Structure formats: structure tokens, C-alpha cells
UniProtKB/Swiss-Prot annotation:
Pathway recorded for this protein: Amino-acid biosynthesis; L-arginine biosynthesis; N(2)-acetyl-L-ornithine from L-glutamate: step 1/4
Taxonomic lineage: Eukaryota, Fungi, Dikarya, Ascomycota, Saccharomycotina
Record's keyword annotation contains Amino-acid biosynthesis: yes
Gene Ontology cellular-component annotations: mitochondrial matrix
The protein's name in its UniProt record: Amino-acid acetyltransferase, mitochondrial
């Protein structure tokens, strides 16, 4: 009878375990699907982070106990800790054993530099919830405390202040004995400096807590071997040194740095275009020098400017260093405020949202003048891709700016460009006819990376009207869905032709919704296969809808049907004395777009 009771209890226990595991897996997957906007994003996230979730298997897998145990994240990490403490290579006989061939489970790091003197208790509680969510999603956080605001006075006085602040932070993050609370530890004297070179004394002191699910909180204190004294260093300097040490070759299998996050009351890098709110996305390879110059033109005070310059410089140095040392260009920089980090919503918290989707909350190519485009205090930063812009004024010294001359001067590889266009559109290009048509009409050619994407803008005519026409906007299939790439190209297109730009798209093109959000208006004739989009400075975004509706009703006899997009759009020129004849423009746009022959067979 006792055996039956024992079996019954074991059966019930197994059922409860099965239910707990099933619920944990389901809840995690549902939360991910809810927070990501596309299947591609959910798939990309799960591909990278799925082995970070140490959910127990419901049924034992075939294989040895050794294989089963070491295929689990926590068991691998426990073994790593033991080997670290014994100064052994943690991967011996784990990944090199041909019979075992276990999957590596690296730490996915997010390094936070927190400047927190003005963070309120409410914000701290929200920040703690964000850290919990990040750890649930597979991120291992490291916190570096920023005390650059302290005066260079007594070391003891500053040290006491730092200890008090760190203890307050620990109490807010949670009680270690509580299962649901965060666990953190404060690390002092992690850095040493000798002959001007900063080193980390023991990387294991940082990695072992991470393997144990504990957040290391690092104080910006260094031991100066030259003076045998302790001192404080600038936090950005230590952040750079920490990242350099973590991407050392011997850590390749142990970890990857996914995010560099700067929590600063100032928020992201300010943008003139966005009326002092933050740049949404910065492609450092293309925009770094321009944005740095923009910061010095006097639209913000020198004191605030210098802090933003320091943040941008530091982010550029770190992301460049990570790329050069590890070849990883996927690390993302995030600069935001304590208030924003404390938001408890996956789709509104830019840090959590970026972990799930690897992009910013809003698209950087959305018109900043549109009232429906949110104003943000967060900037997403990437090492990014190289961009070349060819037009009569840039990167071309020939007498005639034609596609033939670009190809002849080897600035453009015709074969690669053709392959890109065919790959992007999934159709065969009518090569000779296409290049002949655009040759003498070329206005701008934009090339991204090694033919990862491109845009071709031509000059088209309707009578004596000359209009910039987006002839081709192509992204290689392998890069379609790559965060930010389409935005990078489209922003350059609009910057290259800010006054007036048109393009066409087939009515059934699923990309039309994306185009619709970025144009001033669009139109289509019932008998046409095309939807025509237009944008530019000649269209003032603040339209009186009633006046516009009245104007359309007065012109009802015309064959083209117009669909005005924006609720707040006005057909007016750039200055008050200039007005645009919208109907005439639309007729010209229609003539141009309907008259261009298809480029693909």
C-alpha cells in the first residue's frame, strides 16, 4: 500500500513539474510574440537567446548523463565556475570532445553605465523591474556606476558617499533571499592602472557572479600601481577598458556583448531636425562626423554639449573597438534616461524592445514634421554600414554624371548592381534597356556596404517639369528585415532630394504601408496598376483639411483620384508667397510614373 502511495505522489509531482515547465515555456513564448511585431523578429530573437533559458526538460533525452547535464545552461556554468577557480580552461573536454559536440551557451551581456544622482525611488523600482525582465529574456547585466559629477575632493569622503549610494541601490534592487528579487554584488578595486594602461585585475570576479545569475555592480575605483594609491577615473574611460577586456580572444566562447547602455538624465543625442529631441538611430559609419559637427553649431549650451559629445565619442570608440577585436558589428549602443528605463512595458521600454527586435521603438525614417511621429529621448547607436553617395557634386569627378561613367570609372560594379536588383525584386532585369534608360537621367546613386542595398534616383520630365524620381530601392534578400538598413537608405534618399520626390509601387505591394507612413500623399487611377507616392518640402505638412477637401471637390471632373494621407497636411509652398498647384503636380507625377516602362521581364 505504501508503494502505491509513493507512486501516486511521484505521479502527482511529475504532473505538477510538467505543468510548471509547460506554463513557463508558454508564458515566455507568448510574451516574446506579443512584444515583437514580425515573425522574423521573433525568430531572430529565439535563435540567439533560446539556449539562455534553463527550463527543465519534461522527458529525459537519449545520451549519457554527462551529455544531458552539460547540455543545460546552469550545469555548464557551474562547471565553468569550478574550473575558473582552479585556473583551468573551462572548455576542456566539453566543446573539443568530438563525441560530445555540445552547443556553446555564451553569456549575452548588456553593460549599463548609470549616472544616477537624480534618480528617484520610483524610477529605481522601475529600473529594477527592467533588469528582472532583461534577465528573464536571457540578458546578463553588468552595472558600472558613474560618479563623474563628484568634485575632486577627499577620496575618503567620496568613497563613503559611493558606498552609501551603492547600498541604497542594493536595497532597492531586492532581497537576495527572495526568489523573485534580483541578486547583486558590489565590486571594488576591479581596475588597476600602471604607466597609463588600465587593466582588469581579475575578469573572473565579474564572470563568476554572472554565471551565478548575480548582477555585478562595479565602482569606478582603480589602484594606481605608480603611486600605490586608490583613485577615481572617468566612467567612460573605465567603460571602454571593461569592454576591451571582455572581448579579449580568450573570452570568445564565454560571452558576447549585446548592448552598451548609457543611462543619463540628458537622454539621447539631440537632433536639430527633431527640435532638440533625440536622434532615433545613428549609423556611426556614415553619420558620426556630421552629428558631431551639428552638436557644435550652438543649439545647446556648451556644458550640455560637452556631455553629449563625451557620450557619443565614448560609444563610437567602444563599438569600433568591439568590431575590430571580435569582428562583431551587431553590438548595439543605447543612450536613454532613467525615466525611460523605468517604463514597465516591453513595447515602450527601448532597452527591452531592442533586445527583442534589435531596433528602435520607432523608425528613424519617419518624417519628423509629422505630428504622429513620437518625440523620443532615446538614441540607438550602431557601428553600422558604410554608405557611398554619388551625384554630380559628391564622389564623382567626371564631366558627365552618367551610369556609364560610374561603371567605367569602377565606382559601380555593373554585375554586382544587377545581381542586387534581381535578388531584391526577385525578377530578371532587362539589363541593356534599363541601363540605357537611366544612363543620362541619373540624379543620385546610393550604395550601402558591399552591395547590401542601393537606391537609384533619376531626373524625369513632364513637359518642362523636372522631378526627382526614386527609380529603384533595393535591399539584398539576405538583409531584408535587417534592423535599420531600409531606414538608413531612405533617410539618405530624402536628404538628397528634400524639395520634391516621387516614386511608384504596384498596388498590391505589401511595402506600400511602409511607404504610406513616409510620404506626404499618394494617388492612384482606377485603371492603373500603380500607386504613386510623393513627398518634399514643397508640401507643407500643416494642411487645413476642409480647404483641401473643398479644392478636391471643385476638381472632381479630373480622371486621377487622389488620396491625401496626412490628417494635417496643407498644399502650400515653402514660403508664404509661393503656392503649389497640386492638381497640375499630380497630373505631371502621373504622366511620369505611368510613362516609365517596366524594368523587369
Amino acid at each position: 500500500m505504501s508503494k502505491i502511495r509513493t507512486l501516486n505522489r511521484q505521479f502527482i509531482s511529475n504532473l505538477e513539474t510538467h505543468k510548471a515547465v509547460t506554463d513557463a515555456k508558454r508564458n515566455l513564448i507568448l510574451s516574446i510574440l506579443k512584444s515583437t511585431t514580425t515573425k522574423r523578429e521573433a525568430k531572430n530573437y529565439l535563435t540567439k537567446y533560446q539556449n539562455q533559458f534553463d527550463l527543465p526538460d519534461e522527458t529525459p533525452k537519449a545520451g549519457t548523463i554527462y551529455e544531458q547535464s552539460l547540455s543545460r545552461r546552469d550545469n555548464q556554468r557551474e562547471l565553468f565556475i569550478k574550473r575558473f577557480l582552479n585556473a583551468q580552461n573551462p572548455f576542456i573536454s566539453i566543446y573539443d570532445d568530438e563525441e560530445t559536440k555540445l552547443q556553446k551557451i555564451p553569456l549575452r551581456l548588456a553593460i549599463f553605465k548609470i549616472k544616477f544622482p537624480t534618480i528617484s525611488l520610483r524610477q529605481w523600482k522601475g529600473i529594477a523591474e527592467t533588469f528582472k525582465r532583461l534577465m528573464t529574456l536571457g540578458i546578463s547585466p553588468i552595472i558600472l556606476l558613474d560618479y563623474d559629477h563628484l568634485s575632486h575632493g577627499s577620496f575618503k569622503k567620496n568613497e563613503l558617499y559611493m558606498i552609501n549610494q551603492a547600498n541604497k541601490m542594493l536595497s532597492i534592487l531586492g532581497k537576495p533571499e527572495e526568489q523573485e528579487d534580483l541578486k547583486a554584488t558590489i565590486l571594488r578595486n576591479s581596475f588597476s592602472v600602471a604607466d597609463g594602461q588600465i587593466t582588469i585585475d581579475s575578469l573572473e570576479l565579474i564572470l563568476i557572479p554572472l554565471y551565478q545569475g548575480i548582477i555585478p555592480i562595479i565602482q569606478p575605483i582603480v589602484f594606481n600601481a605608480d603611486t600605490t594609491m586608490q583613485e577615481f577615473l572617468k566612467c567612460n574611460t573605465l567603460l571602454n577598458s571593461l569592454c576591451t577586456a571582455l572581448v579579449d580572444r580568450r573570452t570568445t566562447d564565454l560571452l558576447s556583448i549585446e548592448k552598451i547602455v548609457m543611462i543619463d538624465p540628458l537622454g539621447g543625442i539631440p537632433s536639430i531636425e527633431r527640435k532638440q529631441t533625440s536622434h532615433v538611430f545613428i549609423n556611426l559609419s556614415q553619420e558620426y562626423s556630421d552629428i558631431m559637427s551639428e552638436l557644435f553649431i550652438g543649439h545647446i549650451s556648451p556644458k550640455i554639449r560637452d556631455l553629449h559629445v563625451e557620450n557619443l565619442n565614448s560609444m563610437n570608440e567602444i563599438l569600433t573597438s568591439i568590431f575590430e577585436k571580435s569582428g562583431n558589428d551587431e553590438t548595439t549602443g543605447i543612450i536613454t534616461t532613467p525615466e525611460v528605463m523605468s517604463i514597465h512595458n516591453d513595447q515602450l521600454n527601448p532597452i527591452i524592445y531592442n533586445v527583442l527586435t534589435d531596433r528602435s521603438i520607432i523608425s528613424s525614417s519617419l518624417p519628423s514634421t509629422n505630428k504622429r511621429t513620437p518625440q523620443l529621448s532615446t538614441t540607438i547607436v550602431k557601428k553600422g554600414v558604410d554608405v557611398q553617395i554619388f551625384d554630380q557634386e559628391n564622389n564623382f569627378s567626371g564631366s558627365d554624371f552618367t551610369m556609364d561613367n560610374l561603371i567605367a570609372s569602377k565606382k559601380v560594379d555593373k554585375k554586382k548592381l544587377t545581381e542586387l536588383l534581381e535578388d531584391s525584386f526577385g525578377k530578371k532585369l532587362i539589363v541593356d534597356e534599363y541601363y540605357e534608360r537611366i544612363n543620362n537621367r541619373l540624379a543620385t546613386f546610393i550604395l550601402v556596404g558591399d552591395y547590401d542595398g542601393a537606391a537609384i534616383i533619376t531626373w524625369e520630365y513632364s513637359g518642362d517639369k523636372k522631378v526627382a524620381y526614386l527609380d529603384k530601392f533595393a535591399i539584398a534578400k539576405r538583409n531584408q528585415g535587417l534592423p535599420g538598413l531600409a531606414d538608413i537608405i531612405f533617410k539618405i534618399i530624402l536628404q538628397s532630394h528634400p524639395v520634391e520626390l516621387i516614386w511608384r509601387s504596384r498596388k498590391n505591394n505589401p511595402v506600400n504601408k511602409w511607404y504610406f507612413e513616409r510620404c506626404c500623399g499618394c494617388m492612384s487611377a482606377p485603371e492603373s496598376q500603380w500607386k504613386i507616392f510623393y513627398t518634399g518640402d514643397i508640401f507643407d505638412k500643416r494642411i487645413d483639411r476642409m480647404k483641401d477637401k473643398k479644392k478636391q471637390n471643385n476638381k472632381k471632373k479630373k480622371t486621377a483620384t487622389m488620396m491625401m494621407m496626412n490628417n494635417s497636411q496643407k498644399v502650400a509652398g515653402v514660403n508664404a508667397d509661393t503656392h503649389v498647384d497640386i492638381l497640375k503636380n499630380l497630373e505631371q507625377y502621373s504622366d511620369i510614373c505611368e510613362g516609365i516602362v517596366p524594368s523587369f521581364a
